[in-house]
């Protein structure tokens, strides 16, 4: 199941609704751990990733695996894949108002790799897009936290479009 919201209170409620003891959870965009604390109310294995400078010190205080990295990078995906190959819950909050195209690409890459049962995404642009659609043609629907149309694709290759938005720093 895929859930979408903008309000952070709704985001945390949606996470609480789907999480169970024993789940393997990947949290993309943990910042300083406020949502991580909600996730850790259950007995779960949590891998939290964020590239903000404030994240590291706060995340060290919590019982989880923290990776200080950019979730848009293929190297980050590979680093997490070495730790686990599947997850039960994928939580994505890249700032709430962050560019919806980037958030969708991150969702696509991470969910197609880890095949979560549930994905929760916090992003205003995606909510606005969803609520603005006046007609949908085609009978495509997914029951899990990833799109069925790419369920057998494995780890996707690096998406070259990311370089158009966030080019690698020059040496």
Give each language-model segment a name.
Residues 33-37:
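Glycine-rich SAM-binding Motif I of class I
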Residues 63-73:
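Conserved SAM-binding strand-loop segment of SAM-dependent methyltransferases
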Residues 52:
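Conserved SAM/SAH-binding beta-strand->alpha-helix loop
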Residues 22-31:
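Conserved class I S-adenosyl-L-methionine
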Residues 74-85:
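Short amphipathic alpha-helix with an adjacent loop that forms part of the alpha/beta core around
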Residues 59-60:
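Conserved SAM-binding loop
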Residues 1-22:
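S-adenosyl-L-methionine
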Residues 96-171:
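C-terminal substrate-binding/active-site "lid" region of AdoMet-derived donor-dependent transferases
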């Amino acid at each position: 199941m895929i859930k979408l919201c903008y309000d952070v209170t709704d985001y945390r409620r949606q996470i609480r609704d789907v999480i169970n003891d024993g789940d393997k959870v990947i949290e993309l965009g943990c910042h300083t751990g406020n949502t991580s604390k909600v996730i850790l109310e259950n007995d779960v294995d949590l891998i939290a990733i964020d590239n903000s400078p404030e994240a590291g010190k706060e995340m060290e205080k919590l019982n989880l695996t923290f990776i200080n990295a950019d979730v848009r990078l293929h190297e980050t995906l590979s680093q997490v894949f070495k730790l686990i190959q599947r997850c039960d819950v994928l939580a994505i909050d890249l700032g709430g108002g962050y560019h919806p195209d980037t958030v969708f690409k991150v969702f696509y890459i991470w969910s197609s790799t880890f095949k979560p049962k549930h994905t929760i995404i916090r992003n205003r642009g995606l909510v606005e897009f969803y609520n603005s659609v006046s007609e949908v043609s085609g009978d495509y629907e997914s029951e899990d936290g990833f799109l069925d149309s790419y369920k057998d694709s494995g780890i996707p290759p690096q998406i070259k479009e990311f370089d158009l938005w966030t080019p690698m720093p020059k040496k």
